[in-house]
Regions:
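N-terminal Rossmann-like NAD(P) cofactor-binding subdomain of oxidoreductases
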Residues: 1-183
């Protein structure tokens, strides 16, 4: 029996995706959706325990399988987005694409999702039929969570920041290497 929206999850085993899965479990989100787990490297393998009707991993490159989802949440990275997203939209899929990668951030129909900072923008886009929801740069998002109100009040003109994005974007092994260098 289907429960809620069919939500495809891609990139759920990586650094960003595994944190998302932990958060979704803790908040009971899997009770409200019908999750389908996709993989770029292990299609046909066993899906995680949160799977309901689909107990096997689907191929993350299979456009027909992806089209069955009302929502796709991907933490797989920009190369995946660039390879799959245009084909999926060209196939006529009208579902919601939620993406942690930067690949679509500058598209005209993309909405950066950081609800504590821009909830009115998100709500307006949703009311207009928006369906491309893109995560912001992690460093900038964290910064805006802390100082966004100061920007809105005109008390901050600009800010400069540094990041280890190149390492985190490379995955868990690169982060371990970086942390080992710190001692």
């Amino acid at each position: 029996m289907k429960i809620g929206n069919v939500v495809g999850l891609v990139g759920w085993r990586g650094m960003v995706g595994s944190v998302l899965m932990d958060r979704m479990r803790a908040e009971g989100d899997f009770d409200l959706i019908e999750p389908i787990f996709f993989s770029t490297s292990n299609a046909g393998g066993n899906a995680p325990a949160m799977a309901k009707n689909e107990k096997k991993l689907k191929d993350a490159g299979d456009i027909d399988a992806l089209k069955q989802c009302d929502v796709i949440i991907t933490c797989q990275g920009g190369d995946y987005t660039n390879a799959v997203f245009p084909k999926l939209r060209a196939s006529g899929w009208k579902g919601h694409w939620i993406d942690a990668a930067s690949a679509l951030r500058m598209q005209n129909d993309a909405v950066i999702i950081l609800d504590p900072v821009n909830m009115p923008v998100i709500e307006n886009a949703l009311a207009r039929g928006g369906n491309n929801w893109i995560g912001g740069n992690c460093t900038v998002s964290c910064m805006l969570m802390g100082v966004g109100a100061l920007f809105k009040a005109g008390l901050v003109e600009w800010m400069s920041t540094q990041t280890y994005q190149a390492a985190s974007g490379g995955g868990a092994q690169h982060m371990r290497e970086l942390l080992a260098q710190f001692g």
